[in-house]
Swiss-Prot record:
SUPFAM superfamilies: Plant invertase/pectin methylesterase inhibitor (SSF101148)
Species this protein is from: Arabidopsis thaliana (Mouse-ear cress)
Name by which UniProt lists this protein: Cell wall / vacuolar inhibitor of fructosidase 1
InterPro entries in UniProt: C/VIF1, Invertase/methylesterase_inhib, PCW_Enzyme_Inhibitor, Pectinesterase_inhib_dom
Family: Belongs to the PMEI family.
Length: 205
């Protein structure tokens, strides 16, 4: 009985040591992105960040993109009253940011939830593109410059993490993504990808 208690204590200590040794992966992950400081700041601002894996970090950043897009749309709606002469440019920006919310963000979330981050990169990249197009619709200065630049930066950071996550998945599951349809089961990958449909009508392959 005493030996059993000792064994249980040892197991518990080993589990704690593993948790401590692993720690947060925020900093090493952010080193793979184009803006380390922004990446760390965004991820540390969310309580989920300290215990999240790479997929979890990607989801946090997708939430940041969603939040910023929502904030920008609210700003656009306010500008219709303050700057009516900018209506055409604001209409374009409104369409672009609605695309981010209604297409890009859901696409990226679905890719993560299905365990195929590689196929979420397009949505993340497109969020930055939509912001750039919005900015380009203004002749000269834009009241949305700060927000559009922030979206571009967050998009670039998120894309890097999606790419990093894709590499991890490929190393765990095999480099040939179509082979995952065979229900490969490994220590880091238990997935079934048959007939996965993404929200723009795409399939995995």
């Amino acid at each position: 009985m005493k030996m059993m208690k000792v064994m249980m204590l040892i197991v518990m200590m080993m589990m704690v040591m593993v948790m401590v040794s692993e720690g947060s992966i925020i900093e090493p992950t952010c080193k793979e992105t184009p803006d380390f400081n922004l990446c760390v700041s965004l991820l540390n601002s969310d309580p989920r960040g300290s215990s999240a894996d790479t997929s979890g970090l990607a989801l946090i950043l997708i939430d940041k993109i969603k939040g910023l897009a929502t904030k920008t749309l609210n700003e656009i709606n306010g500008l219709y009253k303050k700057r009516p002469e900018l209506k055409r440019a604001l209409d374009e920006c409104s369409r672009r940011y609605k695309t981010i919310l209604n297409a890009d963000v859901p696409e990226a979330i679905e890719a993560i939830s299905k365990g195929v981050p590689k196929f979420g990169e397009d949505g993340v990249i497109d969020a930055g593109v939509e912001a750039s197009v919005c900015q380009g619709g203004f002749n000269g200065s834009s009241p949305l410059t700060s927000l559009t630049k922030s979206m571009q930066k967050i998009s670039n950071v998120t894309r890097a993490i999606f790419y990093s996550n894709s590499i991890v998945k490929e190393e765990a599951c095999g480099s040939s993504w179509p082979s995952l349809a065979l229900n490969i089961d490994s220590k880091a990958c238990v997935v079934s990808l048959q007939n996965i449909q993404f929200n723009r009508g795409r399939t995995c392959w």
